[in-house]
Amino acid sequence: MEASLSNHILNFSVDLYKRLKPSGKDTAGNVFCSPFSIAAALSMALAGARGNTAKQIAAILHSNDDKIHDHFSSFLCKLPSYAPDVALHIANRMYSEQTFHPKAEYTTLLQKSYDSTIKAVDFAGNADRVRLEVNAWVEEVTRSKIRDLLAPGTVDSSTSLILVNAIYFKGLWDSQFKPSATKPGDFHLTPQTSKKVDMMHQKGDFKMGHCSDLKVTALEIPYKGNKTSMVILLPEDVEGLSVLEEHLTAPKLSALLGGMYVTSDVNLRLPKFKLEQSIGLKDVLMAMGVKDFFTSLADLSGISAAGNLCASDIIHKAFVEVNEEGTEAAAATAIPIMLMCARFPQVVNFFVDRPFMFLIHSHDPDVVLFMGSIREL
């Protein structure tokens, strides 16, 4: 069951990331999102979707049955005692217009599988007050890291319901970086240009892996408790991130993550960074195949028999900060591979001094919670 959730989220993560990354001549800009958060919101919508609408949402979640709700339920039930050494909080809520009556089966499923609270509100009479209430709840759940999720105008008197997922993560490194070892260092933006940034440093044993097909080396930095970790995907050269993004697939990423082994005496240099991104996902999800959900063709009859429901957009906002102590992050959705068999040299330098990808994931089950890339600091 849990392995299935791992597969759903991993496949969705890679598909989504490839849509969010810079494309064409636009090679600038950072990316950060929570695939888990977006997938959870979509899965809650899937529970009320029928016909082609359900098929389209299920397809991008790589799910072909209703068991995805059980998979989410199993994972969410673990959270209270899952990783006592880190803060990992996930909350779901449905805001429903007080004159709109969703089906009892739907609200029961949300409560059972997603531990979702259901709140009746007055969209018709005071939509902006509801918007502020949603924002206040998200801000509380994410420890004030996600503010103003819904901008003015995103909610109006015609809104019937809002499905919200919020996720908050704060983990201390299992082996923290010493602030005294942080020094200015070059981060290469292009082969010709670089920027001085605060570069953290430590030497230790880390799991590493290499994929010659993707021309990337991976290094895992565990958080306390070893139930969660950050993985850095470092391309071989300054312009290698675009190559990695173009050729990345879920099976390749899975093989890379599963093929890492402990490497001793690694000199690790990692820049401190902070990111915040707000994304309207309507166009992205429509391009991925979820077309009916945002139009009059939407079939959400599992939510209400009255019909005439469709989504206006899916708003996602994510935040991450990485420093010497650890990481704070928040958000309000088989191919053969050549792994390097030879051991790494006796002393390995892993200098994150060029554009790179990263992800934060849980273990047992292995679920991608956050994913992103840094091109600019």
From Swiss-Prot:
GO terms for cellular component: extracellular space. Keywords: Blood coagulation cascade inhibiting toxin, Glycoprotein, Hemostasis impairing toxin, Immunity, Platelet aggregation inhibiting toxin, Protease inhibitor, Secreted, Serine protease inhibitor, Toxin. Transmembrane segments: none annotated. CDD domains: serpin (cd00172). GO terms for molecular function: serine-type endopeptidase inhibitor activity; toxin activity. GO terms for biological process: immune system process. Induction: Induced by blood feeding. The keyword Glycoprotein applies. Pfam families: Serpin. Changing residue 340 to R: Abolishes inhibition of human leukocyte elastase and porcine pancreatic elastase. Increases affinity for, and inhibition of, human coagulation factor Xa, thrombin, trypsin and plasmin. Female saliva (at protein level). Female salivary gland (at protein level). InterPro entries: Serpin_CS, Serpin_dom, Serpin_fam, Serpin_sf, Serpin_sf_1, Serpin_sf_2. Its main location: secreted. It is found in: Secreted. The keyword Glycoprotein applies. Glycans are attached at residues 11, 226. Inhibition of LPS-induced TNF-alpha release is independent of the antiprotease activity of iris. Serine protease inhibitor with anticoagulant and immunosuppressive properties that can modulate blood feeding of ticks on vertebrate species. Strongly inhibits human leukocyte elastase (ELANE) and porcine pancreatic elastase. Moderately inhibits human tPA/tissue-type plasminogen activator (PLAT), coagulation factor Xa (F10), thrombin (F2) and trypsin. Does not inhibit human plasmin (PLG). Inhibits platelet aggregation. Inhibits the intrinsic pathway of blood coagulation in the host. Inhibits fibrinolysis in the host. Inhibits proliferation of mouse splenocytes. Belongs to the serpin family. This is Iris. It comes from Ixodes ricinus (Common tick).
